Amino acid sequence: MSTDLYGMATLDACSQIIARLAPIREQLDANASFADVAQAAYFNSVDLSAHGFFSLPGDRCGYDWNANPPENYDGPDNAFRGAAFNYFTQGIAISEVEIDVLSGDHRTIRSDVLVDVGSSINPAIDIGQIEGAFIQGMGWATTEEMIWGNEYNHPWVKPYGRLFTQGPGTYKIPGFNDTPEEFNVELMNGVSNPFAVHSSKAVGEPPFFLGASVFFAIKDAISEARSTFLSNEDQFCLNLPATSERIRMLCGDNIVLESIINDEDMAKENDQSIKEKVFTFQPKGCF
């Protein structure tokens, strides 16, 4: 936001001052320093301050409020309507994790992240922003469980619909031990962006969802564990966040079977139907 808007406004102000200094530069020697040009402009009563302004042009980012809605939002008549963003920041992340099938705990062994930030103005700051957003997204996808009050799952949270987990005192945010043991962040080289100052790109929020690579790696690890305990493995649902409870229960071993199937079920159903219950079982939350 700061670089995109304030940077372009600053560029507008600088362009105004440069235009005012052009006649002064022509009067002076070609090797005159900026200080000499500024001093000469001052004594010639040239205004050395400027008010810059910038707003995104409508053809780059905006909405046509008078446009009629398309008949089919997924159809070709709606494929290229409007411009939601001035530009896009691209990124990719690959993560390797290890899960403990007995406790549901996990550790992130390695994460590799590559992000297109255009021509970075300050690579150190951009890399720090990427690291922070990645960890924040990783926490959102693995530990930060939201609990809402409702009649069926959490009736003790009143009134119904109230968010119980309203801060880090009631949900787990990532700590130092949650950081990938090997964390590699790279910026793409040679990428231009003509729609921002110095060809830069915003990087504060875009890398957030890259943390989901840890979530999908956990799901792959769970799938591998389930293939050990369950035959004829099929697709399964892992709800966000991938808490230790959900990881443990979805591994589908005999301990899990015993915990979710009572004695009456064991008496009425065969082994295969009992195991199939694991495919649809989904822990509702840690509370």
Would you name each region that the model predicts?
Residues 99, 141, 185, 201-225:
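C-terminal substrate/ligand-recognition segments
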Residues 2-4, 119-124, 195-207, 229-233:
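Glycine- and acidic
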Residues 117, 144, 191, 224:
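Conserved helix-loop functional segments at active or binding sites
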Residues 169-200:
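Generic long, charged, amphipathic alpha-helical segments
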Residues 221-244:
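Glycine-rich phosphate/pyrophosphate-binding loops
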Residues 216, 221-228, 250, 254-257:
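Hydrophobic alpha-helical segments
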Residues 1-134, 145-176, 239-287:
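Cofactor-centric catalytic regions
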